[in-house]
């Protein structure tokens, strides 16, 4: 058979050449579990006469990917093969790549269609040698397969329909796009990105250095005015923001309710629903960057609004279509008074904003006083039992996963922006809390830190990270957090702003948002259960370090560049850090950092940024870096990815390595985990201690996750994207979770509600369930470490042969398939 090379020449396919090429890529991988010969044999079996070298590489990469269940290192091998193919079709020098992107000519119009802005191009061209020499191409070979494929599909810039950038070129483009000719910070940023020690958010990776560098993730708006000009101005603004790939949070507390008098026309209002349907269609029409994805709007409303019941039905599957707006995300901006009325089984009054003007500008005692006065003066459009409205909220959440639950009073009382006025909403993902009004539309630029990369050995004999012999390296975490804050502050200055109101807000208050990813990975590497006391302590100390480092960076910036414009009057100006607003003092913290000195510095010099931390979902960037999302536990221990050539199984890489070390990893063990839909709790051959570590989010008490959110909350000056995962959900369970969040003082009580029915994962698959149950009751034996015997002999098959077990696993696979083309349908890779 003949293979066609890139230059068009032909040569015979040789097994040795294929095998040697694959073997070269296995450096540093586990030689006991990576079989390059097996891959080569499968590749040879799959080729055809006239195959191109590029198709041959694709076949080899996906063949290696199909073996990922055998060992996680196959993911790195598959990625290396794919990266090697990309390197053959792209320029080696960063400057040449930038030149190609800058000089790109649209093939259809034959007009210039360059992707790089003049400033970035000029900096690169003047400093070719320095920048080209700083790029370390070998780091492209450190990606896992699906991380690289995500980059290739959506992030790396393309010309003529082909990928033009390599990952390292993208990282250098981002560094130069942010820092220009400040080469010290360019190199620092490149090194952090390239070594996967931090990542900027998706819009920054997409757009840094390009013609329109819109680098911000989040935008918050208040309805400009309750009038046709005000509503349509806001509609125009959200359309422009959405066009530039921003996610939107919009507060509509000030829009009058159904039946309210309209003075200008002597008519009555149709309420919020017809208006929101217009916003719904705008979200659908104005997609983000020419068909990448639909626009995303979260609509915030307070529960005293007289149209609240219509609002709660907007996303439901049943009912009149003219009363639905299913492409909008819904959120409640909930005052303490409502929660107290629900708790006390009290009455709840609903008002039209036109009857209680300005009440949305109040919180705490001022809001309660105005609300009670409005009740006493008979302004309510309707009075209902608070628990009846609560039931409707719970029903909507169980059916649709929304509305999000945010607590207005906690958000304002614990905000460093409280001197500006009342915060009226959060953003699309519930982690941003910033002030908005008709003249200011809030913006936030984000980055996240993979905390699992910040571990150091506690064994003096080796620097190797081993389970039970490592701890968090707070010094390294401090250094990266410091530079991340410096970077995000710079993004504010080089960012493209879609409206004048966004520019005014961001340059006056200069908020940033630092989050994390890989917390579950960190606990797995250390070898502790997600919600144990040690994990809770580590969780808090990680966020204390990040907050301290970011605050030091902001004070240092203030010394050089001045404090942010609205600093005076803020809690920080009075020496109050976020934990002080939660009622904690310096002595309540770890003792690791000198908060007393920092307090004196911030009161003397000010801070450059009003807000610093905002742990966000990190769905895409965590996948790129091969980490579990944000601060969440593992959703499952096994799931699949679908690509053009078929479905691939992904198994929790930490679990696989543990099982290999115990001699327990095999096809039968893999199939048992599949039958249990990613849970290991009903597999008694796995030691109990290991099962505790690898509990999925469905098997962890939500109370513990809420407690951990409160624990780190005292260091989070914005908020956090806290999802709730409740199996077999009912009103009592969900109500209990909400009230626990509220009573602990969380700002975000719930982002999405994720639910599933509590059905035995292996029922209905021809398995002898009685035998399985009996086995589980009698076989809670501890497996010695390591197990030397053949793992296959240790696995009880629940009354099935290996073939039957494999077939049953295949039958259940379709339920847990995730497509790279449609990730929104998968709970395993984020919201």
Language model: regions and residue ranges:
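Extended active-site and interfacial segments that coordinate phosphate-rich ligands
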Residues: 18-25, 232-241, 256, 267-280, ...
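Active-site cavity-forming subdomains of large catalytic enzyme subunits
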Residues: 85-90, 94-137, 216-463, 467-474, ...
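Acidic, low-complexity intrinsically disordered tails
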Residues: 763-831
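Core structural elements
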Residues: 51, 66, 142-156, 194-208, ...
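Core nucleic-acid recognition elements
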Residues: 9, 32-172
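Long, structured ligand/cofactor-binding scaffold of large enzymes
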Residues: 59, 69, 93, 139-284
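Internal maturation/activation junctions in enzymes
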Residues: 480-503, 507, 511, 529-618, ...
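Catalytic alpha/beta core of large soluble enzyme barrels
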Residues: 120, 124-150, 430-436, 488-493, ...
């Amino acid at each position: 058979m003949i293979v066609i090379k890139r230059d068009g020449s032909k040569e015979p396919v040789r097994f040795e050449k294929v095998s040697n090429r694959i073997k070269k890529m296995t450096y540093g991988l586990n030689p006991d579990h990576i079989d390059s010969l097996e891959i080569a044999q499968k590749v040879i079996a799959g080729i055809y006469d006239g195959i191109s070298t590029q198709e041959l590489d694709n076949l080899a990469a996906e063949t290696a990917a199909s073996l990922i269940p055998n060992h996680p290192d196959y993911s790195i091998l598959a990625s290396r093969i794919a990266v090697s193919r990309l390197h053959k079709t792209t320029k080696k020098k960063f400057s040449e790549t930038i030149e190609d992107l800058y000089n790109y000519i649209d093939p259809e119009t034959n007009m210039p269609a360059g992707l790089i802005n003049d400033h970035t191009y000029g900096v690169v061209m003047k400093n070719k040698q320095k920048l080209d020499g700083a790029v370390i191409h070998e780091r492209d070979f450190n990606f896992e397969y699906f991380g690289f494929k995500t980059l290739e599909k959506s992030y790396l810039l393309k010309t003529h329909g082909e990928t033009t950038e390599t990952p390292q070129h993208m990282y250098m483009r981002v560094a130069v796009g942010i820092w220009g000719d400040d080469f010290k910070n360019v190199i620092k940023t490149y090194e952090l990105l390239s070594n996967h020690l931090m990542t900027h958010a998706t819009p920054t990776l997409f757009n840094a250095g390009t013609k329109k560098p819109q680098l911000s993730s989040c935008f918050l708006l208040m309805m400009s005015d309750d009038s046709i000009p005000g509503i349509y101005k806001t509609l125009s603004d959200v359309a422009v923001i959405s066009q530039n790939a921003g996610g939107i949070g919009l507060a509509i507390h000030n829009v009058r309710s159904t039946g309210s008098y309209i003075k200008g026309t002597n008519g009555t209002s149709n309420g919020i629903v017809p208006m929101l349907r217009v916003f719904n269609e705008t979200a659908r029409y104005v997609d983000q960057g020419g068909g990448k994805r639909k626009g995303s709007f979260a609509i915030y409303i307070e529960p005293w609004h007289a149209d609240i019941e219509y609002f709660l039905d907007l996303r439901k599957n049943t009912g009149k279509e003219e009363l639905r707006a299913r492409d909008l995300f819904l959120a409640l901006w909930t005052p303490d008074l409502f929660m107290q009325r629900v708790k006390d089984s009290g009455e709840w009054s609903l008002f039209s904003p036109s009857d209680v003007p300005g009440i949305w500008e109040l919180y705490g005692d001022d809001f309660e006083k105005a609300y009670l006065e409005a009740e006493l003066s008979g302004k309510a459009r309707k009075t209902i039992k608070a628990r009846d409205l609560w039931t409707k909220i719970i029903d909507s959440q169980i059916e649709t996963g929304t509305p999000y639950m945010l607590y207005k009073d906690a958000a304002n009382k614990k905000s460093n922006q409280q001197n500006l006025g009342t915060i009226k909403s959060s953003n699309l993902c519930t982690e941003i809390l910033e002030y908005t009004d008709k003249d200011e539309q809030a913006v936030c630029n984000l980055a996240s830190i993979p905390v699992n990369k910040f571990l150091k050995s506690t064994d003096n004999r080796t620097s190797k990270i081993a389970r039970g012999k490592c701890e968090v390296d707070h010094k390294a975490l401090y250094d990266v957090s410091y530079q991340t804050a410096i970077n995000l502050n710079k993004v504010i200055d080089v960012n493209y702003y879609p409206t004048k109101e966004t520019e005014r807000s961001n340059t006056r208050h200069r908020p940033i948002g630092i989050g994390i990813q890989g917390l579950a990975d960190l606990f797995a590497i250390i070898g502790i259960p997600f919600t144990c006391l040690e994990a809770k302590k580590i969780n808090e100390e990680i966020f204390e370090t990040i907050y301290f480092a970011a605050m030091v960076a902001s004070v240092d910036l203030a010394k050089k560049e001045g404090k942010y414009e609205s600093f005076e009057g803020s809690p920080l100006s009075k020496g109050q850090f976020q934990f002080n607003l939660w009622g904690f003092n310096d002595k309540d913290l770890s003792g690791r950092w000198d908060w007393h000195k920092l307090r004196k510095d911030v009161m003397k010099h000010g801070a450059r940024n009003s807000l610093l931390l905002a742990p966000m979902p990190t769905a895409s960037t965590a996948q790129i870096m091969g980490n579990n999302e944000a601060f969440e536990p593992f959703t499952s221990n096994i799931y699949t990815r679908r690509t053009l050539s078929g479905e691939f199984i992904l198994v929790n890489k930490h679990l696989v390595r543990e099982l290999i070390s115990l001699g327990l990893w095999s096809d039968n063990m893999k199939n048992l985990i599949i039958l249990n839909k990613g849970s290991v709790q009903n597999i008694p051959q796995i030691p109990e201690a290991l099962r505790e570590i690898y509990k999925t989010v469905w098997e962890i008490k939500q109370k513990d996750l809420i407690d951990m959110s409160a624990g780190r909350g005292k260091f989070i000056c914005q908020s956090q994207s806290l999802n709730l995962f409740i199996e077999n959900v009912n009103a009592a369970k969900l109500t209990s979770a909400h009230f626990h969040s509220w009573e602990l003082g969380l700002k975000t009580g719930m982002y999405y509600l994720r639910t599933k029915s509590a059905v035995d994962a292996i029922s209905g698959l021809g398995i002898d369930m009685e035998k399985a149950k009996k086995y589980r009751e009698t076989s809670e034996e501890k497996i010695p470490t390591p197990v030397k015997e053949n793992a296959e002999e240790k696995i009880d098959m629940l009354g099935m042969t290996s073939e039957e077990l494999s077939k049953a696993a295949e039958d259940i696979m379709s339920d847990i398939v995730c497509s790279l083309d449609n990730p929104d349908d998968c709970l395993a890779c984020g919201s």
